[in-house]
Amino acid sequence: MELLGVRQPFGPQFQEEKYQMLELNHRLESYLGRVKLLEEENKLLREEIHTLKSSRDPAGQRKAQEEALSQARRMMEEAWRKKDCVELEVENLMEDMEKVSFQRKKVKTAQAEAQRKLTESRKELEEERRAQIWLREKVGQLEKDLMLQMQVHQENMETMQASLKQTKQVLMAPQRVQATSIPDLGQEYGYKAAQAWQEAANNYQKQVGRLEESLNQTKANMTKIYQEKRESQRQVQHLAKELESTRIKRQMLEKHAMQQREEQKEELQHLQAQVNTLELEKDCLGQQIDSLMLDRQHLLQVKMSLGLEVATYRALLDSEGLRIDRPTPNKTSSTVFLDALSKPTGIQSTSQTTAASCLLSSSVSTSHRSIASSRSLLTSAAPSWTLTRGTPQRPPSSTSMTEKTEDHISEETKRSAEESVDQLQQEKVQQDWTLESTLPKTSAEPKPELQPEEIKVEDEANEPQQAHMVESKTDESELTSVPAEQQGSMSQTPETKSWAGHFNDPAEVSEDGKDEDTEVSVEMARISHAPKVAWEEIKSAVEDEKDDASEMDVRSEIISESHTFAYGDAENDSNTLTSSHISQNTNALASSFLEQGTLDSASYFGYEATNENLMKEEELDNVSNISEEVTEQLNSETEAAIDSINEWDRQEESEPENETKVMTSYFEVEEGEMSINTDTKDKTEDDIEREELEVTEREILVQSAGGMLGVDLPNDTDHQDEHNLPQIELNEDQSEAEEENQKEKQCDEDDSPNISASLKTDPGEGDSYSQEHTLADTRPLIRYKSDEETSHHIGETSDSEDEKERIDQGHLNEKRFNTMEDLTEEPDMEVTGKMRLEDLVSNEEAAADDVASVMFQKVSGDHESLDVVVQESERKGNLEKEDSGDADNMRDNKEEDVSVFEQNENQQLTEHQHVHTEQVEDKPVHSHETQEHVNTEFSSTFSERSQQEQLEESSLTMFEDEAATKEAEDSDVSMHTNIDLIDSRSLESEINGQPDIMTSDMANSECNSSEDESPNASQCFQNTSLLAAATPNEQPLTFTNEVSKADYVSDNNDVPEEVLSEEKSTDEPKASQIDDLENFNIWGESTSISDAAQTTHASMDEHSSISPVNENLESSNKIPSVAENIFGHFEEHLERSVESFPEKEVTVMDFENNDLGEEFQSKQMKSEIHSFFSTSLKQDFWSEGKMEMAATYDPAKTEDLNQAMVFGEEWREIGVQSANGDTKEEMEILKIRDDKQKDGQPAQSKIVQSDDSADEGDSWSSGDE
């Protein structure tokens, strides 16, 4: 995990540099072309100049030309002069026009001003007129007032005169003077009247003056008022404008305020959402912290268990003596054991294999030690070239006790007697670290006191029996407090069973017989205070197999949080070690098992029959109560033990390579839950129920992980599913089906050869990684799948049955080479592809034998996948019986010949289809493994380094074409997506209706020639998962995209199981056979390229109901007689439909250009079938990368199975015909055209030719334009 994390940035950088280089190449090409063009032009110009200089013209002609030139110059000057004059005139006219325009503007302005003044004068005149009228009226009124006053005055005068006349004369006294005369009185009164009138006139005159003055003042006031009125109107208008602008501003401000409020509200909502998200993250982190704390406690308990284990082994080594007749320096032992995780006080069942026993001081040649770390088992061993399967012996099931476990311990066959002894390993045995000696008990050897019911078969140590049942009972109350010295003072209440079933190498069955099995005192298990399941790989000499006792076995605890397993491998001659054991675990499981105190440390290798005992509810009541004091005491011992284990592995890596080691089968060890009976009084019933629910949920999650991430995990996943099924009913069904097939498995197990060998990795890395993650790391650790894959090939016969069951249930997973499954539920496609590319590059850099495929796997809490797992288990129980017969036939056919690919191709293809289908999600399918196996079986000159380059280049090819593929998928949905079951069934019926002769011919001939020609013949089976995965939805050969198991199951949830089973049963043989035919040519020489191409088109046309290949793949004997007809069909059809290929068709045709070293010459070719032939990279990418033809898996990219890149559905013309089902008529037409084509153009029967037909291949690739 960490190593790949370091390499991770290499992928995008590599891609970026690649595209930069391509761009630079294009620019350089254009630049060079331009330079070449300019050079040609310069050359022509130089030639022209030279010609002109060489041809000297006459002098007269020169003068004439000069005169003509001077005339032309004069004319040009005149023209320029005229032009200048015209320009001057134009400029003058423009100036005049500007002046006139300016004057015109002035006149208009003056007219406007005069008009304005005239209007104002008219208004003033009107006002004056109105004032004059008013004054006239005023004058008239005053005149009337004057006349009225005059009349009044006249009347007063008359009144006064009348009154004077009426007055009486008064006698006057006589005057001295005589009275005046009458005329004098008249004058006097006249004078008085004139004077009075004058005064009145003066008064009226003054009054008129005052009125006139008041009138003038009123006029002035009126003028002022008028001006004020006009100013007020202007102010009113201005205020109205301001009011309008203010209103607009107010509206704008209101809108802005509203927007601000809305934005503030949205921001508050966003912040609230962020706060909620942070709260959720906080809760999640809190839960993770709690889980980490629980894991830490769990690991402390595991440390304690390791310390107790160390104490136990030290006590054993000190107490038990050497019981071997002679030293066994030639023997090598590789043992690993399973320790129940958090069960320091549980029941320990120890199994021993009898070959040699020794004390700490005995010299033991150990070529391999393996340590099982938490969630990862790193075994530094390499498989030998003859991989065989051992036959496990089924122990009798015991149902009388409440807590039982069966420990299937298998032994490796004995090694050669001449093997040299390395002194380093003698020193290693003496080191004080976690050892468990498999010391057989003899009568003369002192033994701890054992009760009869503890060990039933103790005296059978020296007998070569297949299995020994060891029943031991330990006291619940004394498990945690008994020291290492008190071995025989305990009472035994719970019962555990451990049986040491041995696995015989088929190569040595005749002379070896049965291995010796020994028993280990259960009191030793009591001392260790931790349940353990141990199995050993004893490598001893063939001639000393029965006589010699087993050497001391080094055992290391599996410190996994839930289900762990460990198994060791033997080294091969190349001193390369397989380090690919990865246990699939989750933190949720670890925490749940820690809470309930129950350790589910069942092996991933085992039988389903023990599920009844594994799922007992009593196991949930056990709690591991181990004091912290003991934990602190054992921490240092555990760390020292792990350090010594790592050192031992590194030293063993440098041991002599002259030992010929035989890779025995991996062992199917099924360790039931090691129920630890401790103090359970503090637990309440509510707590127990809660823990049971949690355990059930975790177990379902583990099962779903095994089902979704790998349909058919190689034996370990099978056991995990068996062990983790939450429902007892499902467990019982699986157990019954497994028990029915158990006898057949035991009979046929020795006959099934190994398909592939594990990849080899550096043991030092594995040990360091193991040491890091054993005590501290609570994360899901990486699982090296190559050993699981190897164990799948060499393990129990139940492998093939389980594989077939799961394939029949439709859990189809495409393969992935050297990739990593991301630790998230939905991994990113680019990241996954880049990690895959990183692995390929690292494999190319490393030595060919040091290739290690590392896969990250995390079983997350996928609650939504629980239903899928339940359906899987139900289908598994129903289909298991039907598949057992086929599995037995497959194993019987494998016995006669080491080459699995030559005989009974159909059945074996089905088996290998299961094998490689299972490997898709949970581990990278190691093409190197099968390559190694084939290289030993068949002599070959191909190197693994070239194959690594092939892997790298093929991955690059398919990554580049994924973009075009995506676009084509969107445009061609009708041709590519869901073909319903009706069309599929009709297609299957038509395909199955063809004769069986052609099928047998093609299938058998292809595989036989592949074995003879190609070292990678075994790789043809690795692509069967592709066909198998694409079969239910009629999508064969999914080459660049993959679909997860959960997606596929969800697609098939609404389909009846009968339809699915029938569809699968019809599709499995033909899919596997087509894949074999196709991949044979992928791995073959250039002589078989045409056959491969035609076979590829056969698989293309299979789902378009045109090609008869799939209809004829039922037997395997006579392909040469029929191959030309089939190829002709493909040829004719390709001529008609090759132009309609979408760019989505990727990668399969690439390998056909095996030895073509030149680029495609036509850009039109590239535009039409560019991505189909992957010409963006070198054509020989597929010739070099044929091992990984179909392994460009991307779990994130392909979300839907119907959107995978498939042939047949992308052929537009053929897709319509496939939907219509008119295939028979089309095949007849194709046959007729085939006959004509063979007569006319026999050379075109090959789709892509070898070296001598490159031009013809170009014409084919360009669509026969």
Curated annotation (Swiss-Prot):
Residues 508-520, 730-739, 1252-1265 have a biased composition (Acidic residues). PROSITE patterns: IF_ROD_1, IF_ROD_2. One of its GO terms (molecular function) is intermediate filament binding. One of its GO terms (cellular component) is intermediate filament. It comes from the Eukaryota. Residues 943-956 have a biased composition (Low complexity). This is Nestin. The lineage of its organism: Eukaryota, Metazoa, Chordata, Craniata, Vertebrata.
